């Protein structure tokens, strides 16, 4: 069976970045530290916040994109029924068991999912996509070979899904994309945003010639410049939007200029889509063979 070593590496890399992002969590959210009896914890320094924003800006989009790619790979090789069975065990049961353990750790059961929200959303995508893919018109549409112009439209769509998510969540607020905390806390905007990346992963499977195009040195340099520029624009838009708030704990209660929030949402979309393309190109260029470390990380 063919392995996509570039995407295996990217998946493992995104997993490791999750550890980097969550390690200083107590310093980002001092109120969370109080749950463990830690009071007056020193807030994180700004450079730590910047690293956190950088990782969080592309990690989950990459995760859902790769999930879509590997979903269609399994369906094409083993069929929809086997795909569903595999994902129910690997994703559904994992989410249910470990979210339940998290939930009862405080002595009460209130359907909390905490950091496993992405497994919950992924399971929803798996069920919905399995039904969607049975329709021939949808299957043909997702498997079509894309000309470059359509590819640009797809990237534009990914960018616009962020402000669209704000609209669907009925909130022009920087925290509009806040992830769910319970099974009943789903937001339609978040689902549309993340499912869009899932579908792009599906489309990418039928257009693997894109790997060849974006792994060229010139393409990587251009994507790298665009990605870095997009991130600095993202930081600037963050400053314009929430820079007025002295204490981040007050963000939820603060009113913001809708135009600034819209600009910030577009910058989030630009940043996420460019970094996804850049990392896929980078991994495709330099990761062309398997290794024991990558295989171990992927099988975790």
Where are these regions (language model features)?
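Alpha-helical transmembrane segments and their immediate juxtamembrane cytosolic regions
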Residues: 1-300
